[in-house]
């Protein structure tokens, strides 16, 4: 298939996970190269002396894995047995030779028998020694090998066989691809302008952060001067300045003589190129079917024949040709490769199956005026990639989707191929659809129905059908108009994604993407055959479901079976509906869900926005009449949770019933005489075991499904129908009440108790709610419940209110942006942000608009100019009240967290802002905003300068200069707007099955088997999703945890590092997941002995935390504790103490001063103070911890006893130090001639005190006896009167006991 001519991601990853199990290798060395397309070849081919042992170890590994799989078959069936066939099939690794036409003339390649020949081709293309080959085929025994057959199908091919690489004649397409690849290889490609991917898309900061760890001062650590309370620095999330890469050629582009004239095309001329070398020489090059050669053309004379003087230069590859023309090329190219090799491969690896994340904050263009360089080829790339008419990229998306769904899925190999192809196809479609949607939003695509209203217009671009997510034709008039239509298309994507995940045989869905851009919501769908077909009179346009709203309903017997499967999986109840004439129609799904029989004979399901019932209780609440639409449906996660809850009740009732029946049976048996033979006893034991097995209840008798059409206008006709409809409605109401009375309160309680990770920003909050099945419209209810919990959930309340404000602002901004001409988008956004965030700087901001430019848009909507801070606040309050049924506090705008709110808004609108220190309050103005005018001196100098310069002629220019700081955000700060894409891509069920099987095995203490299965899941994830994908990042994280728990720390570090990079590039450099990835990496680095590196990662994570949340996040308590423990490990006791104190301050503010969590940190802080030679402070903190444990847990609790023991030891030690200090002071008073300055030096006293502890045992014992007779209070009084100097002899023993209190701080660390 043509689709598979795309670039393959790395090598066969199944081989990689096989190699991870070699017992003769350091696993971390292999894990570091998981994604390096060349490393595996180097490992297996370049070191010839080690190859045979590798193969032997692989055979041993195969035998061991085969035995494991046999055990699986004995205990389980289904997926596990399928996995065994996969394992045995991919295990056939062997080495072959490839004969080359040029140096090095032969290479060795390790291959798998299940690989396709094209995979071997790709491996060759990516090897450094064979970069120059792109247009070739492979031969074996003199016969050409088909690129799309597996190596096992090549007759006679075995280990140590030799295949031959034969260079092919070029076609125009191959020549263009060769030029594109050459530009990428030699670093001449430059930056590509892209309307889909924003600036710095796919950015990773990992290498820069790691470099900081490598350059840190040996004597200091990264937290030595860190200020926990300092304001966040935006530099944290910006890319670091890098040295320019070595330049290999000055330029390479298509020549002005291109394309070749007709008569020369007949002679094999394909392209004409122009190359300027580093030496400044310019060469005109002809791309010929035979290769490339220097021709006789100049800028003014056309002569494309080969140049013979000074010498004839030609080659099959451009790489070889340029190396002959430019003496410096080879050295520059090697330097470029070395420079690239210094970076982690993952940071530069191209995206294959995911859209890279575009950061919300970017380096402003003004900071680097030379960032945009002249490159004529940039404008030629579309031709180089797609050809003259762009026809090479036109694809029949719908046919590809449906053909892929029809691929066989019987074996695991079939499923791997099918899911791999599906993932790639969805990624390609999502990107193509998003690009087209941007053009539609910008008005650059002509509509098919230009006479219709704008919202009703439809478009076709790149074989994708586009429409607006608005009610252009009045379909949703009764549901809320444009608001309802906008919600419906979003729900439609979720419904299609759910059906795609079910993968029902015979049921097809169109490729669907929803794109939000510049206030518009655009739907892109693959064109279903027959959807535009004009039916015969009397025929419906739709074959199943509602045709024209709900007035006309169609049914078709062919759809019953496939819709039945879909509805059963989605918990949808089969139910009747009635058309406008009262005629009953029994449907398997909602009346809104439609079935279309395409002209290709396939059954398509459309409009899946009502796969779950309406939230009836929400719609009946006070305030529902003001809600913008009636599309408030329950989430699929909620329906599933409700089903599990009901099933659990069913199972419990069934078990109780069985046990009651069993009890009656046993009672009856006791009344009858029983035999006491051994055989009877054996039978009774067997029956007891059977009884235990029978506790497993058969749930096939449990049925629960919800009717999605209740409370949506259906009118039952008969009494029986009304009764059934009432029962359906009751079930739906129960599900709604389940959400309100159980799910939401449970989430609040889990957050209160610390049983779930605390959200950090709006995105992580939304993910948490959706995972629990809670709709975003319940933010207000969550905020009310959170506020009732008091200070413990104050952070959650703040986050919920901020999210409501951000979403309200998003709706307002979208309304204004929808009809704003493109050149004024930045002005509109900047003005609205100033009204929301910068009112303290300027209470009456005005929009910055070019009046002359405005005149050419007479129909543009410039109503945003009239917005003031007061009107915007009122509108935000109204939106929050209407959408979330929550009333903001009177002065809510005075307590905004400006930076965090700005970030949330930017992410929700797709904004990319220029990085600078934004001033949102007057207090920030003197320090930050006046930098623009270059007079950043002290304010008291201003009047003097005015007097010196004072002329009236200067004042106007001065006013202009100072006008920019008057507002917080100017239009130039809005650097770019990127589209937000919602897709329907399914997850890989095969990879998830392998992962789940591995988890089950680990839970059953089958460690080896569990590891094997999780490694298989890793290889499947990498194959199906590609390396750069959020799902792969999650698995890297889980696998790193697994390796850490099994004490394979180096491998854990490497996988955690990969998790960081992939998370940064796919989810964002400052996402909540990135912070967690850095924190995990820091723990693994510390466990591996790299504590200073770990502290660098913690510092970076804390800086990110400040940006996305602010200070005092509940989960930061654990992080600060970890940092303190790491600092203790480095013997940085003073710094460690500061971090424990900071952790204590946050803990006391969240949990109160008398909580167990606070006592736990007090316990640790007391130990830290003792290590820092502050015995008096240590005693005080340990006493506080002891009192809390005593009050909360009682005197017999282990925590209380241990705190008491430590308190006694610290008290006695402090007393001895205080007494010793007094003795020294008395001796010093007797030495009048002693220099008083020396008495203050404690460095000479400390060793003495430390030495007296073990030496003066007799006297010490007496002293201890006397001290023990006094109470701790009396001892503390004695200490208070003594010298503050303290030290103790037993500090080294503290290290082992520094962490045991963590076992009592489950809640504080959650």
UniProtKB/Swiss-Prot annotation:
Disulfide bonds: none annotated. The keyword Cytoplasm applies. Gene3D superfamilies: Hypothetical protein (hspc210), Tetratricopeptide repeat domain. TPR repeats lie at residues 1033-1066, 1075-1108, 1117-1150. Residues 662-692, 931-960, 1245-1266, 1281-1310 are annotated as: Disordered. It holds the Pfam family CLU. CDD domains: CLU-central. mRNA-binding protein involved in proper cytoplasmic distribution of mitochondria. Belongs to the CLU family. This is Clustered mitochondria protein homolog. It comes from Aspergillus fumigatus (strain ATCC MYA-4609 / CBS 101355 / FGSC A1100 / Af293) (Neosartorya fumigata).
